[in-house]
Amino acid sequence: MTKATLYTKPGCVQCKMTKKDLTKKGVPFDEVDITEDHDALSFVLSLGYKQAPVVVIGQTHWSGFRPDMVRKFV
């Protein structure tokens, strides 16, 4: 299974829900706080996203709490 990258920010409810869903479904991931990592923030913005969470798995990416997308990688 390809490892995901989860871009988050503090106090983000959808970020917590996405993290919980990835963990529950056994999808391995690295979490990156975009408020502390400016390169990560620039990357997320370059993908066209302006809100967290952003999930990147291989060439696929999305924003927001999307359990339907997580299921595709289980």
Per-region residue spans from a language model:
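Thioredoxin-like thiol-disulfide oxidoreductase module
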Residues: 33-50
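A short, hydrophobic beta-strand/beta-hairpin element that forms part of a small beta-sheet core
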Residues: 53-63
